[in-house]
Amino acid sequence: MLKIISGKYKNQIIPTAQNIKYRPSTGKLKEAIFSILTSGEFIGNKLFNENTQILDLFAGSGSLAFESLSRGAGFATLIDIDTYSLKIAAGFAKSLNIENNVHFININALNLQKTTRYLSKQTDRNEFITTAESYIGISKHKSTNITYKLPLKEQFCNMSNKVFDLVFIDPPYNKDIVPKVMKLLIKNNWLKNGTIIVIEMSKTDDYDLDKNIEIIRAKLYGQSKLLVLRYSSHLR
């Protein structure tokens, strides 16, 4: 069971799809991530304010994005290839009354393009729509007995003007995905000077740092490797 650890929505249960295809971060690892992001140079909640833009790649339930929003981040963009997981995440956003602070893009993160205006989540008509109000019909999460009735409301998510303060990358393990995602983020200028990148990967996976990336923290947790990085346009 996933819960929000701290902030405005503390102890809220984050619903997840049954028979999920993704691997959600463990509670221990999630606590470790946010302990790092709220201590040391980040003490005083510097990363989480009304202007903070979050990008959650391979978002699944959106646990990391929702935790960030609970702690004060202003806006989050969740990207995942699994339609049903995003639909449930959108319903959860609406239940928290933060549907206007979240975009959902239903696409393989490796195929994301800067020049595209996405209509996030797919409907049966194979159209892309966005935000928590976008979904048609009812999504019911059995374990929490939460029912979401979501009307259609189309809104675009324009990735061409997006720049993010904090990026979460939590892809399937052992797929050599992280290097490809990092190249995509840098190529499309979605990172700015000082952007923090949090990567969860298998301890056996490797990532050769780009010249513009510095390590803030690197640690092993069981079979997982956690990297907290900073992008700097000044590094050469």
Curated annotation (Swiss-Prot):
A single GO BP: rRNA methylation
Known EC number: 2.1.1.-
Enzyme class: transferase
Ranges where the RPE1 insert domain occurs: 117-160
GO terms, molecular function: methyltransferase activity; nucleic acid binding
Record bears the keyword Zinc-finger: no
A Pfam short name: Cons_hypoth95
Superkingdom, natural source: Bacteria
Sorted UniProt keywords: Methyltransferase, Transferase
Signal peptide: none
NCBIfam families per the UniProt record, alphabetical: RPE1
Protein name per UniProt: Uncharacterized methylase RP545
Source organism of this protein record: Rickettsia prowazekii (strain Madrid E)
